[in-house]
UniProtKB/Swiss-Prot annotation:
Recorded GO MF terms: nucleotidyltransferase activity; sulfurtransferase activity; tRNA binding
UniProt protein name: Cytoplasmic tRNA 2-thiolation protein 2
UniProt entry keywords in alphabetical sequence: Cytoplasm, tRNA processing
Matches recorded under Pfam families: CTU2
Compartments, record wording: Cytoplasm
Function of the protein: Plays a central role in 2-thiolation of mcm(5)S(2)U at tRNA wobble positions of tRNA(Lys), tRNA(Glu) and tRNA(Gln). May act by forming a heterodimer with NCS6/CTU1 that ligates sulfur from thiocarboxylated URM1 onto the uridine of tRNAs at wobble position.
Membership in a protein family: Belongs to the CTU2/NCS2 family.
Cellular component annotations (GO), alphabetically ordered: cytosol
Main location: cytoplasm
Gene Ontology biological process terms, A to Z: protein urmylation; tRNA thio-modification; tRNA wobble position uridine thiolation; tRNA wobble uridine modification
Length: 405
């Protein structure tokens, strides 16, 4: 049970009560015998709950998790068209390397699919330095014959270009920055940023005739996503946010998460073993530079990161819980126009209370004295058929007259 009491939760969201990060355990840079194959190795890899093993045994272990996640569930048809989303993070490069390795094996062990790679350039949204085009071109050379494409976040899929033809100076006008600036809270901006990225992936996959998209989310990312989805009001679709297969994307495109069984330590070791060079640092996603308490997503990520450091097995338990809390599916149930989450079929008392509070705050003293009028206004808002879930409706309210899409 949690040892943090209610009195310990202050304005910082209990981050002050977190245990300080411990030093990571891992690579033993010393000669020794591999406990798996017995080969003398100059570098042993010691994962949590596993014996020290050589580089080849560790890579076999990590790559087996990737193949097993796809093979056990049989979610990837033979010769499927696959789009791999690369953002330059360590996780995305690990997935790229695993996919390339699986496709270069002999016929018996080969992963039979046709893969393409897309890099979503979001530097204009981050406001930082321009993307490292040279490093991306080096990736394209290393992982030939995979085709690499680049598209800017906020642009249409029609602006998709091959890596060799892409130029950072030739970019379409981007309206995403304008919409992000209108959102008051970083929580809303990060949520909207994530939904726009996912919708762009679906559009690119449709343009390239890809039926499946590979997303490089590991166990820590999925645990954070599960808790965040519930907190934002998307509990009804939280199971799909962490599932191996997510079928909510447009045009029937299916999103797969083949790295969901890997943890942060395994990713770090894989990067070292294969000498990969991530294009962005860990924790440099949109909005994370603002600090742990700047948004709900950042605070949740800090909480899960602390669990990963001190109680590694707990993180896997958290995200696997998502598989067991799926809502009952109804064929006629409508979905959100923005995030494709199922809409609430019944009037929720919780949402009614939220809208009631919002109506009182906006109306001022006059209407707040009339409880029936406030409750009636709250019900009207919930029953209004705008095609949005609660979380996306909150974003729409901050945007005003601008549309989400």
């Amino acid at each position: 049970m949690c040892s943090i009491g209610e009195d310990d939760v202050g304005d910082e969201g209990a981050t002050h009560a977190m245990v300080a990060e411990s030093l990571p355990t891992g690579i033993v840079i010393s000669p020794g015998d591999c406990n798996k194959c017995g080969v003398v190795s100059s570098e042993l890899y010691k994962l949590n709950f596993r014996v020290a093993e050589c580089r080849d045994c560790f890579l076999n272990h990590a790559r087996h998790k990737f193949r097993a996640s796809l093979g056990a569930a049989k979610v990837l048809p033979r010769n499927a068209e696959v789009l791999l989303a690369v953002d330059g993070s360590a996780e995305s490069l690990v997935l790229l390397d695993m996919l390339h390795f699986a496709q270069t094996q002999n016929t018996f062990r080969r992963l039979h699919c046709n893969a393409r790679v897309v890099y979503i350039d979001d530097q204009s949204v981050h406001g930082g330095e321009s993307m490292n085009l040279q490093a991306l071109q080096a990736l394209g050379t290393r992982y030939e014959p995979l085709e690499f494409y680049v598209v800017e976040l906020g642009a249409s899929a029609c602006s998709l270009q091959r890596l060799g033809q892409y130029s950072t100076s030739l970019k379409e006008p981007n309206g995403l920055n304008t919409k992000l600036e209108k959102l008051r809270s970083l929580t809303a901006r990060q949520d909207y940023h994530q939904q726009q990225r996912k919708n762009l992936l679906a559009s690119v996959a449709q343009k390239l005739s890809c039926s499946h998209v590979f997303e490089p989310s590991v166990s820590g990312d999925l645990a954070t996503q599960l808790l965040t989805s519930i907190a934002l009001g998307r509990g009804g679709s939280a199971a799909l946010d962490v599932a191996l297969l997510d079928d909510r994307l447009a045009a029937g495109v299916k999103l797969l998460r083949p790295l969901r069984d890997l943890n942060e330590q395994e990713v770090r070791f894989y990067v070292h073993a294969c000498q990969l060079k991530p294009l962005r640092e860990s924790g440099s996603s949109y909005g994370q530079e603002r600090g742990q308490t700047a948004s709900l997503q950042n605070l949740t990520a800090a909480f899960v990161g602390n669990l990963q450091q001190n109680y590694p097995a707990t993180v896997s338990t958290v995200f696997r819980t998502g598989d067991k809390i799926a809502a009952n599916a109804h064929m006629e149930q409508a979905s959100c126009a923005q995030c494709q989450s199922p809409l609430d079929a019944k009037l929720s008392d919780t949402l009614l209370a939220i809208e009631y509070s919002r109506a009182v705050s906006e109306a001022g003293v006059g209407l707040s004295k009339d409880g029936d009028a406030s409750e009636s206004l709250a019900k009207q808002r919930l029953e209004f058929k705008d095609g949005l879930c609660h979380a996306c409706r909150c974003i729409q309210l901050e945007l005003g007259y601008d549309t989400l899409s």
